[in-house]
C-alpha cells in the first residue's frame, strides 16, 4: 500500500510540474481557438482564418525601414487578362492581398487579379494543374517539386517576395536556436548545427537533384557539449536535440537550410506537434520545444520566435561559418538577411526554358518587388519588407 501511495504522490507531483511548465511556456491566448472559430472544423481554412482574424487585421509593428534603395514600379507593358494567384492564406486574411490588388489594378487596368488564398499547401499543386499563374508559399517539399517536374518537365521557379515576420505566429515567424539558461554557450554556426542536429549522410538534395558532394561522415557529428568548447560539468554531457515533427514545413525548412535537405537527423532528436489538452487548449509545438529545453540542462532546440517568448531560456547568435560573424536575432537582422536562418515567401511561377515569362506575371511580380509594393507590405505590419539585394536577384529572374 505504501508503494502505491508513493507512486500516486509522485504522479501528482510530476503532473503539477508539467502543468506549471506548460503554463509558463504558453503562447498568447489570442492564438488559441475561440468561441467563433470553434463553430468550424478544427484545422480548416475558415477555422484558422476566424481564429487569427484579430491578428490579421492589425499591424504588429509600426517602424519604417528605409526602402529608398528599392526600384519604383514603372509599367513595361500593359498586358490584359485575368491573373490567378493561389496559396498563402495569410496574405489574403490580412489587408495586404487586397492592397496589392487594388494598387496594381489602378496601374494596370487591363489585368484583373483573381485570388484563391486558402492555404500555402495548395500553391504548387494549383500551379502544376494549371489552376493558377502564381503560387505563394515557402520552399516546396520534395514531392511538390517531383510532381511538378513529372507534369511539366521542369521544376517551378521561385522569386522571394517578402521576409517572414519577427514574432507574428502564422506570418512565418522565423527560427531561433535555444539552449537552457544555465548553458554557457552564446553562439553557434550553421556548420555546428549540422553536426548537432544531423548525422552521417550519403548526400543531399536541391529540389529533385541529388548531390553526393553534400555527403559527410560520422566524424563531423557533434554529440557532447565539450565538442563545442563548453567546459566544466556540462563538457562531457550528451546534447539533447528538440524541434518540430518532421512532417511539419518548419522541419523541412530547417533541413533545407542546415542539413542539405536530407532526412538524416541526430538519433536522439525529439520532434513535437500540436495537440489539444484536456482543458481544450492547444499545446503548441513551439511551447513544447521551449518547455523541454527549459527543463533539460543538456538541451538545444530550434523553434519559431513568438510574442511572450520566455526569458528563462537563452537564444544563441548564429553564423554561416565557424569564423563568424555571429548574428543576433532581431527585426533588423531578419530584414537585411544577415541572420542566417531567415526565411521568406516566394512567388512560384512556371518559367519554360527558352520562353519569356507571361507578361501579366512579370508585371505583378515587378510591382510587388517595387518600393510601392514593399511599402504596402510594411504598412500591413506583419511580414518584413525585402532588402535591395534580394529584390535585384528576383528581378534578374524575370529577365
Feature locations, PLM:
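Bacterial N-terminal signal peptides that target proteins for export
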Residues: 2-11
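Bacterial N-terminal signal peptides
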Residues: 10-20
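Boundary at the C-terminal end of the N-terminal hydrophobic targeting segment
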Residues: 21-25
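Flexible loop/hinge segments at secondary-structure junctions
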Residues: 26-399
Amino acid at each position: 500500500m505504501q508503494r502505491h501511495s508513493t507512486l500516486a504522490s509522485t504522479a501528482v507531483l510530476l503532473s503539477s510540474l508539467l502543468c506549471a511548465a506548460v503554463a509558463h511556456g504558453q503562447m498568447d491566448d489570442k492564438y488559441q481557438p475561440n468561441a467563433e472559430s470553434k463553430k468550424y472544423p478544427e484545422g480548416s481554412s475558415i477555422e484558422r482564418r476566424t481564429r487569427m482574424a484579430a491578428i490579421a487585421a492589425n499591424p504588429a509593428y509600426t517602424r519604417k525601414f528605409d526602402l529608398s534603395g528599392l526600384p519604383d514600379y514603372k509599367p513595361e507593358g500593359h498586358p490584359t487578362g485575368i491573373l490567378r494567384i493561389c496559396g498563402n492564406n495569410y496574405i489574403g486574411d490580412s489587408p495586404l492581398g487586397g492592397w496589392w490588388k487594388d494598387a496594381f489594378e489602378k496601374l494596370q487596368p487591363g489585368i484583373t487579379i483573381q485570388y484563391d488564398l486558402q492555404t500555402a499547401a495548395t500553391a504548387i499543386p494549383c500551379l502544376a494543374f494549371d489552376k493558377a499563374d502564381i503560387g505563394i508559399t515557402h520552399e516546396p517539399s520534395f514531392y511538390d517539386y517531383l510532381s511538378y517536374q513529372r507534369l511539366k518537365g521542369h521544376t517551378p521557379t521561385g522569386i522571394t517576395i517578402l521576409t517572414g515576420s519577427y514574432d507574428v505566429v502564422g506570418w512565418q515567424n522565423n527560427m531561433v536556436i535555444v539552449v537552457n539558461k544555465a548553458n554557457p554557450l552564446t553562439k553557434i554556426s550553421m556548420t555546428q548545427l549540422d553536426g548537432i542536429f544531423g548525422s552521417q549522410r550519403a548526400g543531399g538534395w536541391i529540389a529533385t537533384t541529388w548531390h553526393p558532394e553534400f555527403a559527410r561522415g560520422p566524424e563531423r557529428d557533434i554529440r557532447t557539449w565539450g565538442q563545442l568548447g563548453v567546459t566544466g560539468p556540462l563538457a562531457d554531457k550528451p546534447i539533447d536535440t528538440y524541434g518540430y515533427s518532421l512532417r511539419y514545413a518548419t522541419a523541412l525548412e530547417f533541413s533545407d537550410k542546415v542539413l542539405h535537405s536530407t532526412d538524416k537527423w541526430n538519433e536522439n532528436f525529439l520532434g513535437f506537434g500540436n495537440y489539444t489538452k484536456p482543458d481544450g487548449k492547444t499545446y503548441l509545438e513551439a511551447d513544447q520545444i521551449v518547455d523541454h529545453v527549459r527543463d533539460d540542462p543538456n538541451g538545444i532546440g530550434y523553434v519559431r520566435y513568438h510574442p511572450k517568448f520566455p526569458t528563462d531560456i537563452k537564444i544563441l547568435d548564429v553564423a554561416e561559418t565557424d569564423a563568424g560573424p555571429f548574428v543576433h536575432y532581431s527585426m533588423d537582422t531578419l530584414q537585411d538577411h544577415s541572420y542566417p536562418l531567415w526565411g521568406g515567401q516566394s512567388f512560384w511561377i512556371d518559367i519554360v526554358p527558352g520562353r519569356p515569362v507571361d507578361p501579366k506575371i512579370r508585371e505583378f511580380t515587378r510591382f510587388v518587388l517595387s518600393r510601392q509594393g514593399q511599402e504596402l507590405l510594411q504598412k500591413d505590419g506583419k511580414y518584413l519588407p525585402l532588402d535591395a539585394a534580394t529584390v535585384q536577384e528576383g528581378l534578374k529572374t524575370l529577365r
